[in-house]
Design a protein with these regions (language model features):
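Phosphate/NTP-binding elements of NTP-utilizing enzymes
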Residues: 2-280
Length: 280
């Protein structure tokens, strides 16, 4: 069952229909923009093109949600593919959004490495020739894995020691969320998301708008409103109601269902048991 509150409902353009009506010759820049728009709106095709992976419908729907929401939680049963779908999301996010910094964290380094290793397995397959060309240098240390891709990085770290406090990220992927202490999430992990991905561009726009306001050309209310693009993805199996996972789950559900809420951030919550998995 899928549920979407009215405040999240919006008119969705049929991009494929519009693109199918294009005729004639496209200039190089326009062709690139058109292709990227098509690939972004057809995640099944894009994933298959880059990696040879054929997504199940529930996996494609989940990927779309991860792209369109700031805070996402997948409470899935064992063997339902949480780490796999996170690995696919990581490389797609970096392909579509250059300079993205993704931080994968877990209660142990072994947990964090699992998603990173999934990405490696996908990239090293014979079908992932195109995807492999997007990746660059790879660094593996005892307490940190890092892989450069499209101007950004995918980094896996353990949640131990003071070292993690120095990291910054646009996307935070937390595996085994139920095992992470609440104070670590609030005081250590959430501050990772403070740096906008396009800080340089935002500063330039602010400087231009400061001058325009001084000249009286625009007013303070006319300033550009930047969309919040930071993301946190929580992956976990189900836990007891007295644990922080359930508390966070209820908090996000309430924010989704609250009709009066005017929060800038958007939320997505998904539950999946092994009985609901497709047979093939």
């Amino acid at each position: 069952m899928w549920s979407c509150p009215q405040k999240y409902e919006r008119e969705v353009e049929d991009v494929n229909s519009r693109l199918s009506k294009l005729e004639g010759y496209l200039e190089d820049k326009e062709a690139k923009i058109t292709l990227s728009e098509f690939l972004r709106n057809n995640l099944y095709f894009t994933t298959y093109l880059l990696s040879g992976i054929k997504l199940a419908p529930y996996q494609e729907i989940t990927l779309r949600a991860l792209f369109n929401r700031n805070f996402s939680m997948c409470v899935w049963g064992r063997g339902c593919g949480k780490s796999f779908i996170a690995a696919v999301y990581c490389f797609l996010q970096c392909v579509f959004e250059p300079n993205t910094k993704i931080l994968i964290a877990g209660p142990t380094f072994r947990t964090a490495r699992f998603i990173f290793n999934n990405i490696e397995k996908i990239v090293e397959t014979r079908e992932a020739v195109l995807l492999a060309q997007a990746f660059g240098a790879k660094i593996k240390r005892n307490d940190q894995y890092e892989w450069r891709i499209n101007g950004g990085t995918i980094t896996a770290i353990p949640l131990s020691g003071e070292k993690i406090r120095g990291f910054r990220a646009n996307v935070l992927v937390l595996d085994e969320f139920m095992l992470l202490p609440e104070d670590i999430i609030k005081n250590v992990l959430m501050p990772f998301l403070v740096a906008p991905q396009d800080m340089t561009r935002r500063m330039r726009i602010k400087e231009v708008e400061d001058e325009l306001i001084q000249q009286g050309a625009i007013e303070e209310k006319d300033r550009t409103k930047f969309e919040n693009t930071s993301k946190m993805i929580a992956l976990s199996s189900a836990s007891y109601t007295f644990e922080n996972l359930y508390k966070t789950y209820q908090d996000w559900i309430n924010k989704i269902q609250d009709k009066e809420s005017k929060l800038e951030a958007k939320y997505f919550v998904s539950q999946l048991g092994y009985e609901a998995l497709p047979k093939e």
